[in-house]
Curated annotation (Swiss-Prot):
It catalyses: [protein]-L-isoaspartate + S-adenosyl-L-methionine = [protein]-L-isoaspartate alpha-methyl ester + S-adenosyl-L-homocysteine. This is Protein-L-isoaspartate O-methyltransferase. One of its GO terms (biological process) is protein modification process. It comes from Desulfotalea psychrophila (strain LSv54 / DSM 12343). It is found in: Cytoplasm. InterPro entries: PCMT, SAM-dependent_MTases_sf. The active site is at residue 63. One of its GO terms (cellular component) is cytoplasm. Keywords: Cytoplasm, Methyltransferase, S-adenosyl-L-methionine, Transferase. PANTHER family: PROTEIN-L-ISOASPARTATE O-METHYLTRANSFERASE (PTHR11579), PROTEIN-L-ISOASPARTATE(D-ASPARTATE) O-METHYLTRANSFERASE (PTHR11579:SF0). One of its GO terms (molecular function) is protein-L-isoaspartate (D-aspartate) O-methyltransferase activity. Belongs to the methyltransferase superfamily. L-isoaspartyl/D-aspartyl protein methyltransferase family.
């Protein structure tokens, strides 16, 4: 079974991610290393490497592998970076980030999801991930500024606290727009200014919070 999962992961990388143009080697290496099937329910493990999102619990999903890889590559991460993730979900995205950068901070507003993700982090010995239960739209100011911020839920607008917590030269990737239809944006902080790029149409679950969907 281990060989089957490894083969499925290699096929996923080759056919779903590299074939669609993701070339960042740090991202590709992380995708190949992290066992995605550990982040879904046991009954769905054989589907973990398919070209689609999967339901987890509490009405949430684990994103399609390509989207995880694409968003990660847009952050242009280095080994010395600290990253803030908004929306821990299954924990898979945080695990990918942890293989690339120095420290990951992740915030989740659904307690049962966070507890489940923490157990997987511990079992896989991903010790450079720090997590908390909170309103992710507020960010995590204690450890700011961050070299990169990734938001894995759709927001009606870019939350001001997240902009405030981005380091100079930092990058943020976030889905912005109405429910069920957002635009993936990359925000780069340049001094006192923010450069915003519109990249792709996407569909994410809601970012629920004071600075997201109420």
């Amino acid at each position: 079974m281990i060989d089957n999962y490894s083969t499925a992961r290699e096929k996923m990388l080759r056919e779903q991610i590299v074939a669609r143009g993701v070339t960042d080697m740090a991202t590709l290496d992380a995708i190949l290393e992290v066992p995605r099937h550990f982040f879904v329910d046991e009954g769905q493990r054989m589907r973990a490497y398919g070209d689609y999102p999967l339901s987890i619990t509490e009405g949430q999903t684990i994103s399609q592998p390509y989207i995880v890889a694409y968003m990660t590559s847009l952050l242009q991460l280095t080994a010395s970076d600290t990253v803030l993730e908004i929306g821990t979900g299954s924990g898979y995205q945080a695990a990918i980030l942890s293989k690339i950068c120095r420290q990951v901070y992740t915030v989740e507003c659904i307690h049962s999801l966070l507890n489940k993700a923490r157990k997987v982090f511990d079992s896989l010995r991903y010790f450079n991930i720090r997590s908390k239960y909170d309103d992710g739209s507020r960010g995590w100011s204690e450890f700011a500024p961050y070299d990169a911020i990734i938001v894995t839920a759709g927001s009606p607008e870019i939350p001001t606290p997240l902009l405030d917590q981005l380091a100079d030269g930092g990058r943020m990737v976030i889905p912005v727009g109405p429910r069920y239809e957002q635009v993936l944006k990359r925000v780069t902080k340049e001094g006192d200014d923010f450069v915003v790029e519109d990249l792709a149409p996407v569909r994410f679950v809601d970012l629920v919070g004071v600075h997201g969907w109420k």
